């Protein structure tokens, strides 16, 4: 991989991991437009590691409180401080984990069809715009009931359909439940941590069964760039979220979906 290839893919991963615009739609489009070959599993693991470090770094203080209070709640046998939010993240991760285990390799391959990605990019783009317009936006992530958490978790499982966008569908679900934009986004990004960890771990295990040559310099550079981009993306997303809302992302998804239909239909 040359520097431009590494730079483009790492920036793309860093930005699309957390913006509600579908990373899979971009990752299928970029190689077609640039004429690049597949970057390999090792590079995918590296850039996901970069985004994982970024989101953990951004929420480091909140995560420390959640971990402390969660451990105290286990010892005390009752909720302590931020322990409920920690349990919420764990419960919200269960559906996507269970569905991911049940999906066969054949099903996963079929879902990677460019037209399926195009349809899900457009369809869930409309849903995101509607949720942002119709949602009451009166609650934060700390007010979620267990039923709410399960609803968001089930919505997150839909992200296994490429083109859906994990952050997009979880933010959409949060807005539908009356969360503020910031509350929906914060819970979505907290949910990203175990999901990226699980996906990256499975990919790393799969990598052990491959014999591909590893370019460690490319992996390190890719992880660094994707991590920096992801951190900046999270920071500025929250900074401008209340001002711009979800409509620009929904419109972008519609345009992206239209381009995918044009190229692959």
UniProtKB/Swiss-Prot annotation:
Highest taxon of source: Bacteria
Catalytic activity: di-trans,octa-cis-undecaprenyl diphosphate + H2O = di-trans,octa-cis-undecaprenyl phosphate + phosphate + H(+)
Cellular component per GO, a single term: plasma membrane
InterPro entries from the UniProt entry: UppP
Miscellaneous field: Bacitracin is thought to be involved in the inhibition of peptidoglycan synthesis by sequestering undecaprenyl diphosphate, thereby reducing the pool of lipid carrier available.
HAMAP family xref list: Undec_diphosphatase (MF_01006)
Family of the protein in this entry: Belongs to the UppP family.
Protein name, entry field: Undecaprenyl-diphosphatase
Organism: Nitrosococcus oceani (strain ATCC 19707 / BCRC 17464 / JCM 30415 / NCIMB 11848 / C-107)
């Amino acid at each position: 991989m040359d520097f431009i290839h590494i730079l483009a893919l790492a920036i793309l991963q860093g930005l699309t991991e957390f913006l509600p615009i579908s990373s899979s739609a971009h990752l299928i489009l970029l190689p077609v437009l640039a004429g690049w070959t597949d970057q390999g599993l090792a590079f995918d693991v590296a850039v996901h590691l970069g985004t994982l470090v970024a989101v953990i770094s951004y929420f480091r203080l909140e995560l420390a409180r959640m971990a402390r209070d969660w451990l105290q709640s286990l010892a005390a046998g009752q909720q302590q401080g931020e322990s409920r939010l920690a349990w919420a993240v764990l419960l919200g991760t269960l559906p996507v984990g269970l569905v991911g285990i049940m999906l066969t390799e054949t099903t996963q391959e079929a879902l990677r069809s460019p037209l399926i990605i195009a349809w899900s990019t457009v369809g869930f783009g409309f849903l995101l715009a509607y949720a942002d317009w119709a949602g009451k936006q009166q609650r934060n992530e700390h007010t979620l009931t267990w039923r709410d958490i399960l609803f968001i978790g089930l919505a997150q499982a839909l992200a296994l359909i490429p083109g859906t966008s994990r952050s997009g569908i979880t933010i959409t679900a949060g807005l539908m439940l009356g969360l503020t934009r910031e509350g929906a986004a914060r819970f979505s990004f907290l949910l990203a941590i175990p999901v990226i960890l699980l996906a990256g771990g499975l990919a790393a295990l799969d990598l052990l069964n491959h014999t591909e040559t590893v370019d460690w310099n490319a992996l390190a550079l890719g992880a660094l760039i994707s991590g920096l981009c992801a951190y900046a993306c999270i920071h500025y997303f929250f900074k401008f979220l209340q001002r711009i809302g979800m409509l620009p992302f929904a419109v972008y998804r519609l345009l992206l979906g239209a381009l995918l239909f044009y190229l692959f239909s």
